[in-house]
Amino acid sequence: METNNHFFYVVKCKDNSWYAGYTNDLHKRVKTHNDGKGAKYTKVRRPVELIFAESFSTKREAMQAEYYFKKLTRKKKELYIEEKRNSKEAVYVKAPNEL
Protein backbone atom coordinates (compact mmCIF):
# COMPACT_ATOMS: atom_id res chain seq x y z
CA MET A 1 0.00 0.00 0.00
CA GLU A 2 1.14 3.53 -0.67
CA THR A 3 2.14 5.41 2.45
CA ASN A 4 0.54 8.68 1.30
CA ASN A 5 -2.95 7.13 1.39
CA HIS A 6 -5.23 7.35 4.37
CA PHE A 7 -7.62 4.54 5.17
CA PHE A 8 -10.78 4.04 7.14
CA TYR A 9 -10.98 0.32 7.88
CA VAL A 10 -13.17 -2.23 9.63
CA VAL A 11 -11.97 -5.49 11.13
CA LYS A 12 -14.10 -8.39 12.33
CA CYS A 13 -13.08 -9.72 15.73
CA LYS A 14 -13.11 -13.31 16.98
CA ASP A 15 -16.42 -12.67 18.79
CA ASN A 16 -17.96 -11.37 15.51
CA SER A 17 -17.96 -7.77 16.72
CA TRP A 18 -16.49 -5.09 14.47
CA TYR A 19 -13.81 -2.52 15.16
CA ALA A 20 -13.41 0.56 12.97
CA GLY A 21 -10.30 2.68 12.77
CA TYR A 22 -7.93 4.88 10.79
CA THR A 23 -4.49 4.04 9.41
CA ASN A 24 -2.05 4.99 6.69
CA ASP A 25 -0.77 1.38 6.39
CA LEU A 26 -3.48 -1.31 6.28
CA HIS A 27 -1.23 -4.36 6.37
CA LYS A 28 0.80 -3.07 9.31
CA ARG A 29 -2.29 -2.00 11.27
CA VAL A 30 -4.08 -5.35 10.95
CA LYS A 31 -0.86 -7.11 11.97
CA THR A 32 -0.56 -4.78 14.96
CA HIS A 33 -4.10 -5.67 16.05
CA ASN A 34 -3.35 -9.39 15.69
CA ASP A 35 -0.09 -9.05 17.62
CA GLY A 36 -2.09 -7.67 20.56
CA LYS A 37 -0.47 -4.26 20.28
CA GLY A 38 -3.40 -2.44 18.69
CA ALA A 39 -6.49 -1.04 20.35
CA LYS A 40 -7.53 -2.33 23.76
CA TYR A 41 -10.84 -3.43 22.23
CA THR A 42 -9.21 -5.80 19.74
CA LYS A 43 -6.48 -6.98 22.10
CA VAL A 44 -8.88 -9.36 23.87
CA ARG A 45 -10.84 -10.24 20.72
CA ARG A 46 -8.06 -11.64 18.52
CA PRO A 47 -7.63 -12.69 15.85
CA VAL A 48 -9.12 -9.93 13.74
CA GLU A 49 -9.79 -10.04 10.01
CA LEU A 50 -10.00 -7.08 7.64
CA ILE A 51 -13.50 -6.87 6.15
CA PHE A 52 -13.54 -3.35 4.69
CA ALA A 53 -11.15 -0.56 3.79
CA GLU A 54 -11.76 2.75 2.10
CA SER A 55 -9.06 5.08 0.78
CA PHE A 56 -9.02 8.85 1.22
CA SER A 57 -6.60 11.53 0.09
CA THR A 58 -6.44 13.17 3.53
CA LYS A 59 -6.29 11.97 7.11
CA ARG A 60 -9.18 14.27 7.97
CA GLU A 61 -11.51 12.64 5.42
CA ALA A 62 -10.63 9.14 6.60
CA MET A 63 -11.18 10.06 10.24
CA GLN A 64 -14.51 11.70 9.40
CA ALA A 65 -15.62 8.46 7.72
CA GLU A 66 -14.55 6.52 10.83
CA TYR A 67 -16.45 8.92 13.11
CA TYR A 68 -19.60 8.70 10.98
CA PHE A 69 -19.41 4.88 10.79
CA LYS A 70 -19.01 4.43 14.54
CA LYS A 71 -22.30 6.26 15.15
CA LEU A 72 -24.29 3.83 12.98
CA THR A 73 -26.22 0.77 14.14
CA ARG A 74 -24.84 -2.62 13.10
CA LYS A 75 -27.48 -2.95 10.37
CA LYS A 76 -26.64 0.49 8.99
CA LYS A 77 -22.93 -0.37 9.11
CA GLU A 78 -23.65 -3.42 6.96
CA LEU A 79 -25.58 -1.21 4.51
CA TYR A 80 -22.74 1.33 4.46
CA ILE A 81 -20.25 -1.36 3.46
CA GLU A 82 -22.61 -2.81 0.85
CA GLU A 83 -23.25 0.62 -0.68
CA LYS A 84 -19.51 1.32 -0.86
CA ARG A 85 -18.74 -2.07 -2.42
CA ASN A 86 -18.32 -0.75 -5.96
CA SER A 87 -17.03 2.73 -5.19
CA LYS A 88 -13.57 3.75 -6.36
CA GLU A 89 -12.59 4.53 -2.76
CA ALA A 90 -13.27 0.99 -1.54
CA VAL A 91 -9.95 -0.83 -1.65
CA TYR A 92 -11.09 -3.97 0.14
CA VAL A 93 -14.55 -5.40 0.82
CA LYS A 94 -15.39 -8.90 2.04
CA ALA A 95 -18.24 -10.74 0.32
CA PRO A 96 -21.65 -10.03 1.95
CA ASN A 97 -21.98 -13.59 3.27
CA GLU A 98 -18.58 -13.25 4.99
CA LEU A 99 -19.36 -10.08 6.97
Curated annotation (Swiss-Prot):
Domain (GIY-YIG) ranges: 4-79
InterPro entries xref list: GIY-YIG_endonuc, GIY-YIG_endonuc_sf, UPF0213_domain
SMART domains: GIYc (SM00465)
Domain of life: Bacteria
Gene3D superfamilies listed in its UniProt record: GIY-YIG endonuclease
Assigned protein family: Belongs to the UPF0213 family.
Annotated protein name in UniProt: UPF0213 protein YazA
Gene field: yazA
